[in-house]
Every structure is written in C-alpha cells, then in structure tokens.
C-alpha cells in the first residue's frame, strides 16, 4: 500500500527500488486523494508499458494519509500487507526479512529505526527526538515488542486489520494506533532493523504540532490493561 500526494518526482525511483528488492509476486496499490495528483501520470505511464502489478485506487475515506492507507487496506487481499511511503524514505532491502518474521507468526512486523542496527538519517531533530522517545519508552516501560511503534513502514496481517477498530482521523497516527491496539488485543508484534532517510524531493506533509495530540492519545492508551474486546470491532466482541 503506497499513499501518495504529488509524489511524481519520487515515484520512478520508488518503483525501480520496489522491482529491485521485491523479487516475489506482489500487487502495489497506489492510493491517491484527487485526480490532479502528479503521481498519477507517472504511474499510468508505467502501467501503459505493461506493468500489471501496479494498481491505482482513489481514497474513499476523505482526503488525507489515514484515508489513503485505509483505502489500500480495503483493497489488499488476504496475507501480508506492507505500507511503503512514496518519498524513498523506507528501507525496501529489509522486506524479505520482514516477510520471514510474518511467516513465523507475527501479525505486525516493524521496520525499526531505533533497535540495534537501525538508523535514522535526516529530518527535523525535534521530530526525531519525540519519535525515538515514544518508541523506546513504549518498549521499555510498557513492553510493546518493538522500539519503533510510530514508524509507518510495517507489514500487517490483513485478517488482523479487519479485526482492529480503527479510529484515527488524520496524520500518520494510524500506524501507532494499530500497533497499540494490536498489542493490547494480544496480537504478535516483531521488528527488524531498518534505515529511514529523509526525503530529497517533494514536500513532506507531516505536521508535528497538529498531529501530536493524536499521537499522545494512542501513546497513553498503550498503558491501559490488555483487553481484546475493547480494541476489536464491535461485531467481533462476544455477546
């Protein structure tokens, strides 16, 4: 699942990286907000050249990255669902290892910047600080088995995604919400080292101060007692 917002400058390089590192069958769902997105003609040109693994899907939840990712989740078939940013920040060389952990029974596999062997290169220092602190404290003090709960670069089990009650409204809070709720509901989480690099083209839409209250909501939720019924969709709860 690839949420995009005017990533035309980055998409050719992203697709090249994907075809280099993902040497197994996959379908890439490019989820966009509006028909004028400059990613679309670039992706359409790749499709016109005979590429059948690339699918364009329009956000059905309302504009924004949360809706774009959820639209991709809805389109994804059963099995592992990988979320990849289009800004070339994610370490696609780690996907095979992430898939190995998924096949060993993990419901979420995190590409972790903050575990031993992981790296974060570039980006605003204060954003880095908050991200690192939240990931490490959730691991050390709550026992969530990843050092990087906030990273969007994750593999999710599609069936688990269908169980979790998603409430995120905006920003990249979605990845933290799902991780926290999956942990509290008893799903298995694992991680592997990953390198994150700040974008070199295009404009980031990350709005720290606007989205921080949403992150804090899920951060503090993590310290609640574990309870599957509280965090899965209502129709899945026992009557």
Could you describe each region identified by the protein language model?
Residues 4, 31-33, 59:
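Conserved sequence signature across two-component system core domains
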Residues 7-20:
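Short, well-formed alpha-helical segments that are part of the catalytic scaffolds
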Residues 26-29, 40-75:
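Conserved donor nucleotide-binding strand/loop of the catalytic core
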Residues 32-41, 88:
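A conserved acidic beta->alpha catalytic loop
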Residues 42, 104, 217-239:
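Terminal low-complexity segments of carbohydrate-biosynthetic enzymes
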Residues 57-75, 80, 92-172, 198-209, ...:
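Acceptor/aglycone-binding surface of glycosyltransferases and processive sugar-polymer synthases
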Residues 172-178:
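Acidic donor-binding loop at a coil-to-helix junction in glycosyltransferase catalytic cores
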């Amino acid at each position: 699942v690839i949420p995009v917002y005017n990533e035309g400058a980055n998409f050719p390089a992203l697709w090249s990286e994907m075809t280099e590192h993902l040497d197994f069958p996959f379908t890439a769902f490019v989820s966009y907000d509006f028909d004028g997105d400059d990613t679309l003609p670039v992706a359409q040109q790749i499709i016109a050249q005979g590429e059948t693994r690339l699918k364009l899907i329009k956000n059905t939840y309302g504009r924004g990255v949360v809706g774009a990712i959820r639209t991709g989740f809805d389109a994804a078939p059963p099995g592992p669902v990988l979320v990849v940013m289009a800004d070339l920040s994610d370490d696609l060389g780690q996907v095979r290892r992430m898939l190995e952990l998924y096949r060993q029974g993990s419901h979420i596999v995190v590409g972790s910047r903050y575990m031993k062997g992981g790296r974060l290169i570039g980006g605003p220092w204060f954003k880095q600080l908050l991200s690192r602190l939240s990931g490490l404290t959730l691991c050390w003090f709550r026992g969530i088995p990843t050092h990087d709960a906030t990273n969007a670069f994750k593999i999710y089990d599609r069936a688990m995604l269908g169980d979790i009650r998603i409430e995120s409204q905006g920003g990249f809070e979605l990845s933290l919400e799902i991780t926290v709720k999956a942990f509290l509901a008893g799903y298995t989480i694992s991680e592997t080292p990953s390198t994150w690099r700040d974008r070199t083209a295009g404009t980031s839409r990350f709005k720290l101060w606007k989205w921080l209250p949403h992150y804090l909501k899920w951060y503090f939720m993590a310290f609640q007692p574990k309870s599957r019924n509280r965090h899965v969709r209502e129709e899945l709860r026992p009557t």
